[in-house]
A protein has these predicted regions:
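Membrane-interface helix-cap regions at the ends of transmembrane helices
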Residues: 20, 24-27, 31, 45-61, ...
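Specific transmembrane alpha-helical segments of multi-pass solute transporters/efflux pumps
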Residues: 17, 21-22, 50-96, 100, ...
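Glycine-/small-residue-enriched transmembrane alpha-helix faces in small-molecule transporters
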Residues: 1-36, 142-169, 290
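Transmembrane alpha-helical segments that form core, pore/gating elements
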Residues: 49, 107-109, 113, 144-200, ...
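C-terminal transmembrane-helix exit sites in multi-pass transporters
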Residues: 48-58, 84, 103-125, 250-270
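Hydrophobic/small/kink-forming positions within alpha-helical transmembrane segments
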Residues: 16-19, 23, 50, 74-78, ...
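Helix-helix packing/entry segments at the starts of transmembrane helices
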Residues: 38-40, 81, 95-102, 166-188, ...
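Hydrophobic transmembrane alpha-helices of multi-pass small-molecule transport proteins
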Residues: 49, 70-72, 102, 119-139, ...
Length: 290
């Protein structure tokens, strides 16, 4: 197995973990406030990450890398969780799943601008086609207009892509598990304060389903998923492996159907299938890495 295929396979494991984030967030919001979910899950993940760093006796980040960790944290610890959780307060996880299908293109663009990866024209065409499918889907679902929920999802997706690209590149020379751990750890002071401010005493009475959902968002969506995702990006390249994210909408649609009882409409399935097809095509396109 070559590096690109290995990177895509490892990255796919991370995507499977991430694909449950939106439907599980919907379940958690039946009990918890959206802001508590966003900050609380990062707080718990940060505490676990701090313990992991202590166990591994990881050295402190260098001054050069500290700026990268801050950018990563702004993207995946704050931006994406806050914006997408707010979107899920009123939007459906099925709708959000397909809108976030634009993330591979965003990751590719950021990778090209930041790290001079050079995808072929064919790769760009396939990526743009996949992103166009997502836009068309959004317009069809909202009677020809883009809603503020779409805006939250798009900006949240861009935040995540910035964190993905910076983290994936840093993981080429720093252990991917250390990268996500430090990103969470340096965010702890803010997340501890915000978790305290958004906590409600009624949360002590949360049922097992709510607690399990919160734990999944904290330990898997915010922490363990990045073990695989960052390693996949580092091995296979940002532009190539980021295309695996196009499979995430279909995985999320299935999860929403099973966990929430969301109906798998013909429109959802058709567009998810078309988007996944672009992943298969992109695998055949040339991407040069510097």
């Amino acid at each position: 197995m070559n590096k690109e295929s290995k990177g895509m396979l490892i990255g796919f494991v991370g995507i499977l973990i991430f694909s449950l984030t939106l439907p599980v967030s919907k379940i958690a919001m039946l009990t918890f406030d959206p802001y508590f979910i966003a900050f609380g899950r990062a707080c718990l993940a940060g505490l676990v990450a701090l313990g992991y760093l202590a166990y591994k006796k990881a050295p402190l980040p260098s001054k050069k890398d500290l700026a990268k960790y801050i950018v990563i944290a702004l993207g995946i610890v704050f931006g994406f969780p806050i914006l997408t959780t707010l979107a899920m307060k009123e939007g459906s996880s099925s709708h959000g799943a397909v809108i976030l299908g634009m993330m591979p293109l965003a990751s590719t663009v950021i990778g090209v601008l930041r790290f001079k990866e050079r995808p072929s024209l064919g790769f760009w065409f396939v990526s743009l086609f996949g992103a166009t499918l997502v836009v068309v889907y959004a317009l069809l679902k909202s009677a020809g207009s883009v809603t503020y929920i779409d805006g939250l999802l798009v900006f949240g997706g861009i935040c995540a892509c910035v964190g993905y690209v910076e983290g994936g590149e840093l993981s080429r020379r720093v252990n991917p598990r250390i990268v996500i751990s430090w990103s969470l750890a340096i965010s702890l002071p803010i997340n501890i304060v915000m978790t305290y401010l958004t906590f409600n005493a009624d949360y002590w009475m949360a049922d097992a389903i709510a607690l399990t959902s919160f734990l999944y968002l904290s330990l898997f969506s915010m922490f363990l998923g990045f073990f695989f995702w960052y390693e996949g990006l580092a091995i296979g390249g940002i532009a190539r492996v980021s295309q695996v994210q196009l499979i995430q909408p279909f995985c999320t649609l299935l999860a929403a159907s099973i966990l929430l009882g969301d109906h798998l409409t013909t429109l959802n399935v058709v567009f998810a299938f078309l988007v996944i097809s672009t992943v298969i095509l992109s695998k055949k396109m040339l991407v040069q890495r510097n």
